[in-house]
Amino acid sequence: METAHAPVLAPGALPLLGHALALSAPLRFLRSLPAHGDLVEVRVGPLRAVVVCDPALTHQVLLNDRVFDKGGLVLKRGREIAGNGLGTCAHRDHRRQRRLVQPAFHRHRMPHYASVMVRQASEVMNAWRPGQIIDVLDEMGTVSIRSIAAAVSAALPPGRADSLIADYFSLEQVLYRRMLTPPPFDRLPTPGKRRYDRARARLQQTVQEIIAVHREGKPDRGDLMSMLLLARVAPSDTDDGRRLSDREVSDQIVSFFLAGAKTVAETLSWSAHLVATHPEVRQRLHAEVDTVMSASVPLYGDLHRLKTTENIVKETLRLYPAAALTRTTTTATELGRYRLRAGTTVVYSPYLLHRHPGLFPDPEHFRPERWLSIPAADARAVYLPFAAGPRKCIGDTFGFMECTLVLAMLAARWQLEPVGDSDSSPVFGATLRPRRLRMRLIARTGTEDEPPASPA
């Protein structure tokens, strides 16, 4: 039997700094690591992490959440905002929370959520005008956070939705920098830290107010908040079936806002960029939406026929998924032929996996048609935009549906044209966003207001 050994240290580590200088070009550094081994150690100052570069070992990490629990700097910063929500809680709390939250994302709820998404996207797009230059990420962020806010609570006043949008952007701008700021420097009262603290407090206060309104009114308003407040499961050997507390409900909602809005906004922005820069794909997309949709507003019932749109979203998520996510070992263990101590930060990268030439031929190129020939079972093994295993994103269907519906609506109404000062280079964080994506709107149809879509 082969003896387990420690992961190899990535080359270029400097005294005290570790790989901090190499990480000034983070994606280049990340993509250099597989050449050095299946597990590679990275250091930044006093921080240590092991990056998993092998697909099979990545799946072992994701499937065994008891040993490879949620943890690391990404999760530490996430917990500052989202507390002990489903996306940030430890293994010991996860099963109970998952059982309680799951009904809110049952497939029979999706038609209602779809109508909410389409209505919110229509309101944003109805304000656009031909020839206008938009910041695509800002606009898609507005669509996404408004959609989540409306899906969460039918009782949310419009002014509160606007404040949620502002607070979301404030938190998103600072969060990645805080992930890489070691203690005690993360507690210094810098202007960014003060903005972060104020936005975090306002967001949590808004969610508490929404909960209070729901507690006082009718128990089921048909929204996600109602489902969480009413959720209860039968007692089992591992939990007593208690409802979610108000604090737990608040943590879930804040998690949905932060994780869901960011992922959807960035995916839609990258999709718009990729469609605009690939004319043959744009032509196929326009032909599909013109054929499938009776108006410029898609319906839930159109989804199964929007295959080109769906494949564009899939391919976008392949090229621009999460860059680096973390787990922490709860005990000493072995991963493949490597030994890991308890408390080791383990980094896995959907970005690395999705650009592996042995898994995806011609991996650097945008080819939505590749998904016509990839069996679903094969995709599940190598395609991880929403992770995998027990901690797979609970909102994967919700988020993918929103991306598909909004992209279809965008393509039906507008053609987007990049402008000169646009910069589509990816900015590294837990996820990847375009640096500056400005595009000119060219109308394909009239821009008059569309009626709200029904959930049919």
Where are the model-predicted features located?
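Cytochrome P450 I-helix active-site segment
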Residues: A6-A13, A114, V118, A166-S170, ...
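N-terminal membrane-proximal hinge/A-helix region immediately C-terminal to the signal-anchor transmembrane segment
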Residues: M1-R96, P111, S115-E123, P158-G159, ...
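Cytochrome P450 heme-thiolate monooxygenase catalytic core
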Residues: M1-H5, K70-K76, D93, R109-E266, ...
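Cytochrome P450 catalytic-core helices
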Residues: T263-E288, T397-W414
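Cytochrome P450 proximal C-terminal region
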Residues: A121, S144, F169-S170, D290-A295, ...
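Conserved cytochrome P450 K-helix/beta-meander segment immediately N-terminal to the heme-binding cysteine loop
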Residues: V67, Y348-P375
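Conserved cytochrome P450 K-helix E-x-x-R motif and the immediately C-terminal K′/meander segment
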Residues: L14-G37, Q205, E209, S296-G336, ...
